Amino acid sequence: MKRAPTKQPAKPAARGGERAQGRVIAAHGRHYIVAPADGGPMLQCFPRGKKSEVAVGDRVAYERTSADQGVIVEIGERRNLLYRSDQFKSKLFAANLDQLLIVLATEPYFSEDLLGRALIAAEANELKPIVVLNKIDVEAALPVARERLAPYRALGYDVLELSVKGAPDDARTQLAPRLAGHSTILLGQSGMGKSTLVNLLVPDAEAATREISAALNSGRHTTTFTRLYPLQDGGALIDSPGFQEFGLYHLTEGRLERAFPEFRPLLAHCRFYNCHHLHEPGCAILEALADGRIAPTRHALYAQLVHEASQIVR
């Protein structure tokens, strides 16, 4: 008879190796920075296992493996999770958000497609969207920018006009009350003034970025990771790298149609309950498009997003 294998004694816990709670404040690949809930020094953490589903803003449980490192063992329940996706993969932005702030500028020419997609993402995740039009001191480009944003104002979206560099005090006065006490993600194309806005609202942002970058071992690549900054008046600002595309392949057709506020009052009036709002007879959305109540650019965005959702590899 074989002897039962001798049970190996449990390895002693690493220094401070008990499970503790914290919040993810930065992410770069599979590297995460966690701020302990007890206020101790931040840690570089890695997810347990090969697959990583951790996002900035997550409340997590971690186990310390050394003085300044740990492993994330559990993700707390999320209120929401914002991410973008193409037909093959998804990229997490952040979790547990209240608001989405998208930064545009009079120049360079901003992408209306990206603006529309960001607003749809906000609506689909029940986030309050805030649109900032920066560089209003570039007066020659201001009328065109206002004209392009007029349809969004008409839909009820909050559009703030400011000049972060030209009138920083006014910019701070407009933004601070809207951000206080809320977790807000900041999105914007390169060149829109997003970094300047972060530095205005978070005076020590550059120092914090250098510290986090060093902890992530990301060296000079300081703009390639998402990070969270606590705000003086409560709440947090989450800065995500400048982006040039915003896929929403993961949104179902049902979620998409409800993410257009101008569609919602009409959805119950289509002739067919499973109307796709593309070519169907008796479609209330298409009737509103024909008589000018819905902008052609908005319906075109809806049609494009429905097409993208049909291409996803599940």
Swiss-Prot record:
Sorted alphabetically, the Gene Ontology BP terms of this entry are: ribosomal small subunit biogenesis
Q: Which residues form the CP-type G domain?
A: 85-246
Keyword vocabulary terms for this entry = Cytoplasm, GTP-binding, Hydrolase, Metal-binding, Nucleotide-binding, Ribosome biogenesis, RNA-binding, rRNA-binding, Zinc
Q: Which Pfam families match?
A: RsgA_GTPase (PF03193)
| One MF annotation (Gene Ontology) recorded for this entry | GTP binding
> Where is GTP annotated to bind?
N134, K135, I136, D137, G188, Q189, S190, G191, M192, G193, K194, S195, T196
The record, for SUPFAM superfamilies, names: Nucleic acid-binding proteins, P-loop containing nucleoside triphosphate hydrolases
Residues at which Zn(2+) binds: C270, C275, H277, C283
Q: How many cofactor units bind, and how?
A: Binds 1 zinc ion per subunit.
Q: Can you supply one Gene Ontology CC term for this chain's record?
A: cytoplasm
Supply the InterPro entries for this chain. Answer: G_CP_dom, NA-bd_OB-fold, P-loop_NTPase, Ribosome_biogen_GTPase_RsgA, RsgA_GTPase_dom, RsgA_N
Specify where the region named Disordered lies, as residue ranges: 1-21
Task: Report the locations given in the UniProt record.
Answer: Cytoplasm
Q: What is its EC number?
A: 3.6.1.-
The principal localisation class reads cytoplasm
Which cofactor(s) are needed, names only?
Answer: Zn(2+)
Assembly, in brief, is: Monomer. Associates with 30S ribosomal subunit, binds 16S rRNA.
State the function annotated in the UniProt record: One of several proteins that assist in the late maturation steps of the functional core of the 30S ribosomal subunit. Helps release RbfA from mature subunits. May play a role in the assembly of ribosomal proteins into the subunit. Circularly permuted GTPase that catalyzes slow GTP hydrolysis, GTPase activity is stimulated by the 30S ribosomal subunit.
Family indicated by similarity: Belongs to the TRAFAC class YlqF/YawG GTPase family. RsgA subfamily.
Tell me what this protein is called.
Small ribosomal subunit biogenesis GTPase RsgA
* Organism of origin: Burkholderia pseudomallei (strain 1710b)
Q: Which gene encodes it?
A: rsgA
